[in-house]
Amino acid sequence: MKKEDLRIVYMGTPDFAVEALRQLVEGGYNVVGVITMPDKPAGRGHKIQYSPVKQYALEQNLPLLQPEKLKDEAFVQALREWKADLQIVVAFRMLPEVVWNMPRLGTFNLHASLLPQYRGAAPINWAVINGDTETGITTFFLQHEIDTGKVIQQVRVPIADTDNVEVVHDKLMILGGKLVLETVDAILNDTVKPIAQEDMAVVGELRPAPKIFKETCRIDWNQPVKKIYDFIRGLSPYPAAWTELHFPDKTSVVVKIYQTEKCLQ
């Protein structure tokens, strides 16, 4: 089968997901449909804002679906009508089996870590927060448990001591687009040899990457300097580490900190 004949459905929402879609389209792959989150009001005026993936899909005149519920019968039927051979997921939602099990060649996900490390919603943040000097990206086939499917390919990426989460995000975004294309080509050429995550060598214990909430971002000044430094850059520029300044009149103000320099070890 030629790449032009492979029917691909792409699922994603944020900027991180646009790059792989762009490389697929510009590479001449047959993207027959795009699925993204429903539009949401944003800002003070609560104006409807399109997701970055939707904006790109509209620019390229790609068919688009924005389901509220992924098990909705109308959505599932519309998805079936696209007759996808392969589905690709990048920074989207957890899919029900009726969706990920639909294409004959399966559904694969691009995850921003070296699985099985950092399974979860915020792998880039936690890799930087934990002071890692290396992270990476992984493509893997979806199965029932989140981020546990068989690994297809991985690429390692260094993290510099001065990198914040935005810098690492952008590195992984560009390389992730290339890895998605390489994974599609491997599937096309039937050269994929998936590896079960439990069979992969892991240095140290497995670290999770849970969703980050506001309280997660509060700085603990009792931590060592290096940990505070890594914590701040692992949350910069978004959602941003924060602390409280207390004044003699017993008032206080919340301050977000985006950048620091280490003066002590």
Predicted feature locations:
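N-terminal glycine-/serine-/threonine-rich beta1-alpha1-beta2 phosphate-ribose binding loop
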Residues: 41-85
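Short beta->alpha connector loops
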Residues: 13-16, 68-71, 91-94, 263
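Short active-site oxyanion
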Residues: 6-9, 83-87, 216-217
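Internal anion-binding site segments
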Residues: 201-265
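Amphipathic, non-transmembrane alpha-helical secondary structure
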Residues: 18, 22-26, 76-80, 97, ...
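Donor/substrate-binding cores of folate-linked one-carbon enzymes
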Residues: 27-30, 37, 86-208
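N-terminal Rossmann-like dinucleotide-binding module
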Residues: 1-45
